[in-house]
Design a protein with these regions (language model features):
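Generic hydrophobic alpha-helical membrane-segment signal
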Residues: 20, 99-102, 200
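Polar low-complexity intrinsically disordered regions
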Residues: 12-14, 156-161, 214
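Hydrophobic alpha-helical segments, principally membrane-spanning helices and signal/leader peptides
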Residues: 17, 96, 197-199
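Glycine-rich anion/phosphate-binding loop at the beta-strand->alpha-helix junction
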Residues: 29-31, 36-181
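Short, flexible active-site loop motifs that bind/organize anionic cofactors or intermediates
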Residues: 26, 105, 206
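Intrinsically disordered, low-complexity linker/loop segments enriched in Gly/Pro
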Residues: 1-43
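Catalytic-core signal marking the mid-to-C-terminal active-site face
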Residues: 162-163, 169-214
Length: 214
Protein backbone atom coordinates (compact mmCIF):
# COMPACT_ATOMS: atom_id res chain seq x y z
CA UNK A 1 0.00 0.00 0.00
CA UNK A 2 1.31 3.44 -0.89
CA UNK A 3 0.66 6.73 -2.67
CA UNK A 4 2.13 8.08 -5.91
CA UNK A 5 1.64 11.71 -6.92
CA UNK A 6 1.77 13.23 -10.41
CA UNK A 7 1.45 16.88 -11.40
CA UNK A 8 -0.48 17.14 -14.69
CA UNK A 9 -0.69 20.93 -14.92
CA UNK A 10 0.76 23.79 -12.91
CA UNK A 11 -0.94 27.11 -12.12
CA UNK A 12 -1.56 29.58 -13.62
CA UNK A 13 -4.04 28.20 -16.11
CA UNK A 14 -7.76 28.10 -16.80
CA UNK A 15 -8.25 25.43 -14.16
CA UNK A 16 -5.21 26.13 -12.00
CA UNK A 17 -2.92 23.26 -11.14
CA UNK A 18 -3.99 19.64 -11.56
CA UNK A 19 -2.50 17.01 -9.27
CA UNK A 20 -3.28 13.29 -9.26
CA UNK A 21 -2.75 11.13 -6.18
CA UNK A 22 -2.63 7.40 -6.93
CA UNK A 23 -3.57 5.20 -3.99
CA UNK A 24 -1.78 1.86 -4.40
CA UNK A 25 -3.62 -1.03 -2.74
CA UNK A 26 -2.78 -4.73 -2.51
CA UNK A 27 -6.21 -6.25 -3.12
CA UNK A 28 -4.95 -9.82 -2.63
CA UNK A 29 -7.46 -12.20 -4.28
CA UNK A 30 -10.13 -9.57 -4.96
CA UNK A 31 -10.40 -7.57 -8.15
CA UNK A 32 -10.61 -4.65 -5.76
CA UNK A 33 -12.79 -2.05 -7.48
CA UNK A 34 -15.13 -1.55 -4.52
CA UNK A 35 -12.25 -1.46 -2.04
CA UNK A 36 -10.24 1.10 -4.01
CA UNK A 37 -13.25 3.32 -4.68
CA UNK A 38 -14.20 3.28 -0.99
CA UNK A 39 -10.68 4.25 0.05
CA UNK A 40 -10.57 7.04 -2.54
CA UNK A 41 -13.81 8.48 -1.19
CA UNK A 42 -12.55 8.26 2.39
CA UNK A 43 -9.18 9.93 1.75
CA UNK A 44 -10.02 12.51 -0.94
CA UNK A 45 -10.80 15.43 1.38
CA UNK A 46 -7.70 14.84 3.49
CA UNK A 47 -5.43 14.68 0.44
CA UNK A 48 -7.04 17.85 -0.96
CA UNK A 49 -6.36 19.73 2.29
CA UNK A 50 -2.71 18.66 2.26
CA UNK A 51 -2.36 19.75 -1.38
CA UNK A 52 -4.23 23.01 -0.82
CA UNK A 53 -6.83 22.26 -3.46
CA UNK A 54 -10.22 20.67 -3.90
CA UNK A 55 -10.95 17.01 -4.66
CA UNK A 56 -12.10 16.00 -8.13
CA UNK A 57 -12.72 12.42 -9.22
CA UNK A 58 -12.43 9.76 -6.52
CA UNK A 59 -12.34 6.52 -8.46
CA UNK A 60 -10.08 3.67 -9.47
CA UNK A 61 -8.15 3.53 -12.72
CA UNK A 62 -8.47 0.54 -15.02
CA UNK A 63 -4.86 1.03 -16.09
CA UNK A 64 -3.53 -1.36 -13.44
CA UNK A 65 0.11 -1.21 -14.47
CA UNK A 66 1.22 -2.30 -10.97
CA UNK A 67 -0.77 -5.51 -11.36
CA UNK A 68 0.63 -7.15 -14.47
CA UNK A 69 1.09 -10.74 -15.54
CA UNK A 70 4.09 -12.03 -17.51
CA UNK A 71 3.85 -15.29 -19.48
CA UNK A 72 6.69 -16.87 -21.46
CA UNK A 73 6.91 -19.94 -23.65
CA UNK A 74 9.46 -21.66 -25.87
CA UNK A 75 8.46 -23.80 -28.85
CA UNK A 76 10.77 -26.10 -30.79
CA UNK A 77 10.86 -26.07 -34.59
CA UNK A 78 9.48 -29.61 -34.67
CA UNK A 79 6.30 -28.40 -32.96
CA UNK A 80 5.93 -25.52 -35.42
CA UNK A 81 6.18 -27.64 -38.57
CA UNK A 82 3.04 -28.19 -40.64
CA UNK A 83 2.10 -29.84 -43.93
CA UNK A 84 2.89 -26.73 -45.95
CA UNK A 85 6.06 -25.49 -44.23
CA UNK A 86 9.01 -26.74 -42.23
CA UNK A 87 9.54 -25.60 -38.64
CA UNK A 88 12.29 -23.03 -39.36
CA UNK A 89 10.14 -21.43 -42.06
CA UNK A 90 7.14 -21.13 -39.73
CA UNK A 91 9.37 -19.78 -36.97
CA UNK A 92 10.78 -17.05 -39.20
CA UNK A 93 7.32 -16.07 -40.44
CA UNK A 94 5.90 -15.73 -36.92
CA UNK A 95 8.88 -13.67 -35.74
CA UNK A 96 8.54 -11.41 -38.79
CA UNK A 97 4.82 -10.89 -38.12
CA UNK A 98 5.60 -10.01 -34.50
CA UNK A 99 8.21 -7.49 -35.61
CA UNK A 100 5.66 -5.96 -37.98
CA UNK A 101 3.30 -5.43 -35.01
CA UNK A 102 6.09 -3.69 -33.10
CA UNK A 103 6.65 -1.28 -35.97
CA UNK A 104 3.07 -0.59 -37.11
CA UNK A 105 0.14 0.35 -34.83
CA UNK A 106 -2.37 -0.78 -37.45
CA UNK A 107 -0.95 -4.29 -37.29
CA UNK A 108 -0.52 -4.06 -33.51
CA UNK A 109 -4.26 -3.42 -33.09
CA UNK A 110 -5.11 -6.71 -34.82
CA UNK A 111 -2.24 -8.49 -33.05
CA UNK A 112 -3.64 -7.41 -29.67
CA UNK A 113 -7.21 -8.20 -30.68
CA UNK A 114 -6.11 -11.81 -31.14
CA UNK A 115 -4.62 -11.73 -27.66
CA UNK A 116 -7.85 -10.41 -26.16
CA UNK A 117 -9.82 -13.24 -27.82
CA UNK A 118 -8.16 -15.55 -25.31
CA UNK A 119 -8.40 -13.43 -22.20
CA UNK A 120 -12.03 -12.41 -22.75
CA UNK A 121 -13.12 -16.04 -22.92
CA UNK A 122 -11.43 -16.82 -19.60
CA UNK A 123 -12.71 -13.65 -17.94
CA UNK A 124 -16.34 -14.11 -19.02
CA UNK A 125 -16.34 -17.75 -17.90
CA UNK A 126 -14.94 -16.86 -14.47
CA UNK A 127 -17.18 -13.85 -13.81
CA UNK A 128 -14.58 -11.10 -14.20
CA UNK A 129 -14.98 -7.52 -15.43
CA UNK A 130 -13.66 -8.17 -18.92
CA UNK A 131 -14.39 -4.60 -20.05
CA UNK A 132 -12.07 -3.23 -17.36
CA UNK A 133 -9.29 -5.59 -18.44
CA UNK A 134 -9.79 -4.64 -22.10
CA UNK A 135 -9.55 -0.93 -21.27
CA UNK A 136 -6.43 -1.43 -19.19
CA UNK A 137 -4.75 -3.64 -21.77
CA UNK A 138 -5.13 -1.14 -24.61
CA UNK A 139 -4.03 1.78 -22.40
CA UNK A 140 -0.99 -0.28 -21.34
CA UNK A 141 -0.18 -0.94 -24.99
CA UNK A 142 0.09 2.86 -25.48
CA UNK A 143 2.16 3.64 -22.40
CA UNK A 144 5.27 4.58 -24.41
CA UNK A 145 3.39 7.06 -26.58
CA UNK A 146 2.74 4.64 -29.46
CA UNK A 147 0.40 1.65 -29.68
CA UNK A 148 2.50 -1.50 -29.23
CA UNK A 149 1.90 -5.28 -29.12
CA UNK A 150 1.27 -6.88 -25.74
CA UNK A 151 3.09 -10.05 -26.83
CA UNK A 152 6.25 -10.49 -28.88
CA UNK A 153 7.81 -13.51 -30.57
CA UNK A 154 11.52 -13.93 -31.22
CA UNK A 155 13.54 -16.60 -32.97
CA UNK A 156 15.53 -18.49 -30.37
CA UNK A 157 19.17 -17.37 -30.28
CA UNK A 158 21.11 -19.94 -32.27
CA UNK A 159 17.94 -21.19 -33.97
CA UNK A 160 15.92 -24.29 -33.27
CA UNK A 161 12.77 -22.69 -31.93
CA UNK A 162 10.60 -19.70 -31.08
CA UNK A 163 10.35 -17.76 -27.81
CA UNK A 164 7.24 -15.80 -26.86
CA UNK A 165 6.54 -13.33 -24.07
CA UNK A 166 3.38 -11.50 -23.02
CA UNK A 167 3.18 -8.70 -20.45
CA UNK A 168 -0.13 -6.99 -19.66
CA UNK A 169 -2.20 -5.71 -16.74
CA UNK A 170 -4.68 -8.28 -15.44
CA UNK A 171 -6.74 -7.23 -12.43
CA UNK A 172 -8.87 -10.28 -11.63
CA UNK A 173 -10.44 -11.71 -8.51
CA UNK A 174 -11.43 -15.06 -7.06
CA UNK A 175 -13.38 -13.58 -4.13
CA UNK A 176 -15.83 -10.72 -3.73
CA UNK A 177 -17.90 -8.92 -6.31
CA UNK A 178 -20.58 -11.00 -7.99
CA UNK A 179 -18.71 -14.29 -7.60
CA UNK A 180 -20.62 -15.37 -4.50
CA UNK A 181 -23.93 -15.21 -6.43
CA UNK A 182 -22.62 -16.53 -9.76
CA UNK A 183 -22.59 -20.36 -9.57
CA UNK A 184 -21.31 -20.72 -13.13
CA UNK A 185 -18.29 -18.56 -12.40
CA UNK A 186 -17.59 -20.42 -9.16
CA UNK A 187 -17.71 -23.72 -11.04
CA UNK A 188 -15.34 -22.41 -13.73
CA UNK A 189 -12.85 -21.31 -11.07
CA UNK A 190 -13.03 -24.72 -9.40
CA UNK A 191 -12.57 -26.58 -12.69
CA UNK A 192 -9.56 -24.41 -13.52
CA UNK A 193 -8.04 -24.91 -10.08
CA UNK A 194 -7.62 -21.17 -9.63
CA UNK A 195 -8.36 -20.40 -5.99
CA UNK A 196 -5.97 -17.43 -6.03
CA UNK A 197 -6.14 -14.34 -8.22
CA UNK A 198 -2.52 -14.66 -9.33
CA UNK A 199 -3.20 -18.18 -10.63
CA UNK A 200 -6.25 -16.96 -12.54
CA UNK A 201 -4.19 -14.13 -14.05
CA UNK A 202 -1.52 -16.62 -15.11
CA UNK A 203 -4.14 -18.87 -16.71
CA UNK A 204 -5.67 -15.95 -18.61
CA UNK A 205 -2.22 -14.78 -19.69
CA UNK A 206 -1.38 -18.24 -21.02
CA UNK A 207 -4.63 -18.26 -23.01
CA UNK A 208 -3.70 -14.83 -24.38
CA UNK A 209 -0.30 -15.94 -25.62
CA UNK A 210 -1.76 -19.13 -27.10
CA UNK A 211 -4.47 -17.37 -29.09
CA UNK A 212 -1.93 -14.83 -30.33
CA UNK A 213 0.22 -17.65 -31.70
CA UNK A 214 -2.63 -19.53 -33.31
Amino acid sequence: VGIDVRVLARAPGPDGGVLVAHLLVDCRDAMGANLVNTLCEALADRVARIAGGRPGLRILSNLTDRRTVTVRCSIDDAQLACEDAAGPEVRAAIAAASRFAELDPYRAATHNKGIMNGVDAVLVATGQDWRAVEAGAHAFACRGGAYRPLAVWRERPGGGGLDGELVMPLAVGTVGGALHVHPGARLALELAGTERADRLAALAGAANLTTNLT
